[in-house]
Amino acid sequence: MSTPHHQFESKSSTAIRRRLSSSVSSKQRPNIMTTTFASLTPMWAGVAGTLVNNNTQYEIAVTVHDGVYSTDFASVIIPVTPGDTVKNSKDIEAQVLNLIRKFSAEHLCKFLGAGITLALLKECPNLCTRLWLDMDIVPIVFNIKPFHTDSVTRPNIKHRISSTTGSYVPSGSETPTVYVEASHLDDPSHLSPNAAQKLPIPRTLDEQSDSAARKCLMYFGPNNNPRLSIGARNQVTVDAGGKIHLIDDLEEYRETVGAGTWNAVIKLADELREKKVKIGFFSSTPQGGGVALMRHALIRFLTALDVDVAWYVPNPSPQVFRTTKNNHNILQGVAAPDLRLTQEAKDAFDAWILKNGLRWTAEGGPLAPGGVDVVFIDDPQMPGLIPLIKKVRPEVPIVYRSHIEIRSDLVHVAGSPQEEVWKYLWNNIQLADLFISHPVSKFVPSDVPTEKLALLGAATDWLDGLNKDLDPWDSQFYMGEFRSPCAKEKMHELNWPARDYIVQVARFDPSKGIPNVVDSYYKFRNLLRTRSPDMDESEHPQLLICGHGAVDDPDASIIYDQIMALVNSDPYKEYAHDIVVMRLPPSDELLNAMMANSRIALQLSTREGFEVKVSEALHTGKPVIACRTGGIPLQIQHGKSGYLTTPGDNDAVAGHLYDLYTDEALYRKMSDFARTHVSDEVGTVGNAAAWLYLAVMYSRGEKIKPNGAWINDLLREETGEPYKEGETKLPRTKLDMQG
């Protein structure tokens, strides 16, 4: 039984609550009215705790911060059971969540982040996990001491930060304790004196929680997103260098996969830990694209397993990124026919990668002697590193990972732009020990020796902001947040939840088939008019086309303008008021809410890599209508979890949309099947197993010759965890990888 020690004192406005609230019904639940709020106020919290009353009770303090000031405070005291740490932990957990939920509901706010004291986390190890998964709060842990500390710099300059990094102490470093005469304190009995018989100045629990809230706020940047953190030598310090604790409980990861996958991961991770193998990933961008999303999730999981892994990115260069994007489009066959890789662009590209590479091969760098033991290099931006590594450390195994489609039918056409780009890249890639491709036919040029070729799909994380289940309270916050950029750009708004919507989540890229999405929607609306004339137009679903871009993607604005021009032209402008086209700020939860609250998902790419966005949609129970391109057919079971169409066959897409929207039984059947038939291979844990396997095999000194095999098949065999009958996996159809 908890005892309120100090209650929240601020009062919410009933007038504002009334003005922001509305009661609506949805097409799925027409007879149930749901109260929603137009917007929720972003807030932050600080949480601290300590044992009191001779360790018989535990006091919890929560400070509320609005981004400028600490606005409120509450504390509660709960009894503790001596020796029962599990029960005590769960009781503390429940009280913290209850205090925050209560304040959220009463004040119409959404907590985005919470500073957690290390002392509290030690008593309640899974508190951060629960805050993240249950309340969508980013927990950031700080070692806030129960006594006052002072600056390590001289008092007269302690508020100045020198231009030299060595002159100031980074957050989390040890700072000296402030001591005073024992006689100056009212009740010094619980404090320990130092050698000079002086005592530290105590910091009360409310001061500790307030400090945690203020420190937490420092880690949030524009659009209230956690700041990206880049460390020395451009190492991506995932989760603010470990201060952000999203998933502390490995059991949460275990529950996302089957026993075979999990057992394999644990066996491989154990061997790498014992051998102290160091793994290094090198890719072009730390945020925004699919590769960056996978790497953040992978590093987070492997760090939780205590595997020694690091991820590095180069200094960004807009000039080089334009070149790499052109190369990407050329290799996929979606660039203008006259676009070429010039010698000037090659020279700038080579100089850029050499400059960055020399930082990593210099003494103490990840590629210098004593650095990483296995190197993984992502995509066509980084292969220039390979010859440099081979020169400095010829013994280090290098794995090249290709995430994109390489038109094997075009790269061997003499004089073609594709041949030109591929020859330039292959000159470096051929020095790698292994070439990993998506398991899609004709994705690999014939230059790549079959014995070096291995297959691995893309992945997504079921526990990150992009895919985790959002509480309805948090979901409505993000739907409300979506209205802000729509209003700012004078874009039409979604009328959700009163109306359903169809969604395609993808970058604004020439290969994503967005014109086909618009045309398919137009034809679908015409079908509703002709085949279901009794259905009111207000019951017709809207269309949402959205996505956010990568740092190295300069095409987005060009494609966005083309789509807006198309939507407002004949014949599509008739439905333009129901088409929402938005580039979103970089918020994973925002994309999550857009997908989770949709009715049907589309993915009408004309050229594609693997496109794991399809599995993300299926995981939420959304039937997906997509084109037979890239790795998409591997993820959808036609007629069971969605429909596969030929690129450009917009009449077929419209027909499938009509069937799914008007036949509730069909929709429910497909939705249930989609939700329960997603392979472990496309999740972080299954994907991590592949990287762990490669690191283990190379650490044993073995020369891997996969001969076009799936890495997941090799690792399951190696670890003695073969696939069992009925276990969901991507179809192992016969592939013609090199056309």
Curated annotation (Swiss-Prot):
GO terms for molecular function: alpha,alpha-trehalose phosphorylase (configuration-retaining) activity. Keywords: Carbohydrate metabolism, Glucose metabolism, Glycosyltransferase, Transferase. The keyword Metal-binding does not apply. Its EC number is 2.4.1.231. Residues 1-28 are annotated as: Disordered. Homodimer. This is Trehalose phosphorylase. It comes from Pleurotus pulmonarius (Indian oyster mushroom).
